[in-house]
């Protein structure tokens, strides 16, 4: 493992720039700087940003809060991608402006599915037997 890599294999620089992009996007969306009716009426959480190794592409994972419709929010974000890219480029100092790709964050759904499975009485019983 290289000195500047995390155990997952991503460099610290990629993680740092990804966090800067995430904070910039969160700030833009929270302040309502995007003039879009859908984005104005939905609270959107930017959960993660994964940068490509050359920092030219950013995959942005978002989750609408309060049960908002993911498809409508993703479509609105994709419609406003050019504005968001220019704002992020202005706030995050990198050589190139990253192209943003918006995807729905499925990790919360996967986590709740695993939680439901672990609460299933038959599985809980098996887990208790294994612990003994």
Curated annotation (Swiss-Prot):
Protein's cellular compartments: Cytoplasm
UniProt signal peptide: none
Molecular function per GO: ribosomal small subunit binding
Keywords linked to the UniProt accession: Cytoplasm, Ribosome biogenesis
Membrane-spanning residues: none
A cellular-component GO term for this protein: cytosol
Record has Transcription as a keyword: no
InterPro entries: KH_dom-like_a/b, RbfA, RbfA_dom_sf
Stretches of the chain forming a coiled coil according to its record: none
Source organism superkingdom: Bacteria
Keyword Cytoplasm: yes
One of the protein's GO biological processes: maturation of SSU-rRNA
Family: Belongs to the RbfA family.
NCBIfam families listed in its UniProt record: PRK00521.2-5, rbfA
Quaternary organization: Monomer. Binds 30S ribosomal subunits, but not 50S ribosomal subunits or 70S ribosomes.
Function of the molecule: One of several proteins that assist in the late maturation steps of the functional core of the 30S ribosomal subunit. Associates with free 30S ribosomal subunits (but not with 30S subunits that are part of 70S ribosomes or polysomes). Required for efficient processing of 16S rRNA. May interact with the 5'-terminal helix region of 16S rRNA.
Protein name (record): Ribosome-binding factor A
Native organism: Rhizorhabdus wittichii (strain DSM 6014 / CCUG 31198 / JCM 15750 / NBRC 105917 / EY 4224 / RW1)
Gene: rbfA
């Amino acid at each position: 493992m290289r000195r500047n890599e995390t155990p997952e294999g991503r460099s610290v620089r990629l993680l740092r720039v990804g966090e800067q992009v995430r904070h910039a996007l969160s700030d833009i969306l929270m302040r309502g700087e995007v003039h879009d009716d859908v984005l104005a009426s939905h609270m959107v959480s930017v959960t993660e940003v994964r940068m490509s190794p050359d920092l030219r592409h950013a995959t942005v994972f978002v989750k609408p809060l309060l049960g908002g419709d993911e498809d409508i929010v993703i479509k609105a974000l994709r419609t406003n991608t050019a504005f968001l890219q220019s704002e992020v480029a202005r706030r995050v100092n990198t050589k190139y402006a990253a192209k943003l790709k918006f995807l729905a964050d499925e990790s919360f759904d996967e986590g709740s599915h695993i939680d439901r499975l672990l609460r299933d009485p038959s599985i809980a019983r098996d887990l208790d037997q294994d612990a003994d």
